[in-house]
């Protein structure tokens, strides 16, 4: 390789290959060995063209002259590679808003307009709807409400104390999936993503409670398969088409002719966001109505049945209200606990804690471990009961439920399949998810749903859940069988999933007995999931 001029009259120096491996612009540089020559001929140098203007006086200088070498090196430095692409404007950071503009933006936001419904308020758009948004509402909203079975009157006519007053706005946001035209607006995109972030956990919790009460003897494995067969993303287009909503999601395409990766993400996004809006405005009973009446989900359909597996014989009793009948969605949606009920969700408690647990009352764990566990968790809570016997009965059931939370499947599952924490763990996972989702939505008003999803996942990673339980030294009270006790005590790969399951079972028990407020107390005050409380030195 050498630097040479292409002709005596040429003014350009070009890199050209030659049989003699020498560099002609300097005699002071020795010849390179063949290895160095192969390095210089790499692809990153092939596209680099060195152009230098050779003046007459440079040509007149001898080859060994230092002035000639300096001039050629100076010209060589001016050679540049290909121009770098300028990043798109949306990736260029903008200067932050000053305090005055930021305060105005938040104070004028609809998200701070409802003091009595903080969760609903946090899911409203960050700015008021504009004319383009209202155009979509005028054209399509009546069709949506008619398909879902709602009144065609504008929801703004309702009173301020009714959360359904904002249903039209949330319903509009629910259908603005990321692939549609209106999703480019910031308030629409963030509003839709925040709704689907909440809606996915609403669906999981609703179907979990439904199947736990419908199948009081079944383990969580088959129930998870039933839930997936109803709301798995590959099945959602079928439900959207059953409600005749596909033209609102794909106004320019035939949904049946789209490939899966183009059809399923928008449908899933709209489906989740729709149930987030329904839950915020009407609560869980309306979620059941839309699922089973509007979309026509059938839990008894052949495609919704779990795969056949070896079932352990269940010889224990179930509660009287489950005996001899299978509950339907109407029974669960319309159920209201009696005034003197022991628990916030009495039927769900009976579905998770078998009546036979009373045989463990007064055992060694009940006397030795239960007081320490209850003291750590802050139980029993103070309740305003009319009759003293109700308080005593609740505390007895609370103790039995706590013992079930710490009862590992290795102890009694093969003889008594429901004498373990699995069913409480299942409902605890879902109530834990929705409690954290509501917390993040109210805490981060301007965050999009995708960011909240990642934050949610990191805060609730299984290994962290078990770690919080171990920090309270509660893992020492888990009841293992004698055969596996030493293995679980000294092997973290076995111990950590078990402690995670116990923590989720505790959340499930708290939900069934005291309701969602106690789940929040355990997560954010006792176990400090967000790790924001000062640590004891």
Curated annotation (Swiss-Prot):
Presequence positions on this chain: 1-51
Keywords: Chloroplast, mRNA processing, mRNA splicing, Plastid, Repeat, Ribonucleoprotein, RNA-binding, Transit peptide
Pfam families in alphabetical order: Ribonuclease_3
GO molecular function term, any single one: ribonuclease III activity
GO biological process: one example: mRNA processing
Principal localisation: plastid
Occurrences of domain RNase III (ranges): 141-283, 415-515
InterPro entries cross-referenced by the UniProt entry: RNase_III_dom, RNase_III_sf
Keyword Protein biosynthesis appears in the UniProt entry: no
Keyword Thylakoid belongs to the record: no
Alphabetized SUPFAM superfamilies for the sequence: RNase III domain-like
Disulfide bridges in this chain: none
Gene3D superfamilies membership: Ribonuclease III domain
Domain of life: Eukaryota
CDD domains: RIBOc (cd00593)
GO cellular component: chloroplast; ribonucleoprotein complex
Intracellular or extracellular location(s): Plastid, Chloroplast
SUBUNIT field: Interacts with RNA. Part of large ribonucleo-protein particles that contain CAF1 and/or CAF2.
Purpose: Binds specific group II introns in chloroplasts and facilitates their splicing. Acts on both subgroup IIA and subgroup IIB introns. The substrates of the subgroup II also require the CRM domain proteins CAF1 or CAF2. Binds both single-stranded and double-stranded RNA non-specifically, but lacks endonuclease activity. Required for plastid ribosome biogenesis.
Protein's name in the database: Ribonuclease III domain-containing protein RNC1, chloroplastic
Organism of origin: Arabidopsis thaliana
Record gene name: RNC1
